[in-house]
A protein has these predicted regions:
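Core segments of cupin and vicinal oxygen chelate
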Residues: 1-32
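Residue-level detector of high-confidence beta-strand sites
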Residues: 13-15, 76, 107
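Residue-level detector of conserved, well-ordered beta-strand and adjacent loop positions
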Residues: 25, 37, 98, 108
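Short glycine-/small-residue motifs
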Residues: 33, 104-107
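Short, flexible turn/loop "capping" segments at secondary-structure junctions
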Residues: 42-44
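Eukaryotic phosphotyrosine signaling hubs
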Residues: 46-50
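Vicinal oxygen chelate
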Residues: 51-100, 104, 111-118, 123-137
Length: 137
């Protein structure tokens, strides 16, 4: 992590020490993101992935567009999914997929709601339900 912070000057967005994971903004908050995990500690057996900033509209449409191109969209845990997930600590909507060389890629859209790290990672529909319940209180 020191390399990315001190040498490259990346801004740390989030640290999950118990999972040996660190996330860095590239180009400032809300833009592209680099996620790093200790060997074998990351979801989907990854040690690195790159997240590209996208609009929420593009994120919501991505599973359908990827499927039409023969690419499987996946959830945070690597399971095939037809809807985005929401990462509560950011919060951001995300869709994961791999390129032809098996590199893990992510489309990411920051959401306007307040961060909810306590919910972890949930499906888009679960997130919308949580937001609606909170608004009703």
């Amino acid at each position: 992590m020191e390399f990315y912070e001190r040498v490259l000057g990346f801004q740390r967005a989030y640290l999950v020490a118990e999972r040996e994971a660190a996330f860095y903004w590239i180009g400032g908050p809300g833009h592209s993101m680099l996620g790093l995990w200790g060997a074998g500690a990351g979801p989907q057996r990854m040690s690195l992935h790159v997240a590209f900033s996208a609009s929420l509209e593009d994120i919501l449409d991505a599973p359908k567009r990827l499927e039409a191109a023969g690419v499987v969209s996946r959830d945070f845990w690597g399971e095939p999914s037809k809807e985005p997930v929401v990462i509560g600590w950011m919060p951001a909507a995300a869709v994961y997929f791999t390129d032809p060389d098996s590199h893990l890629l992510e489309f990411l859209a920051m959401l306007p709601e307040s961060a909810r790290p306590e919910i972890g990672v949930v499906t888009w529909n679960q997130w919308r339900g949580e937001i609606e319940r909170s608004a009703a209180l």
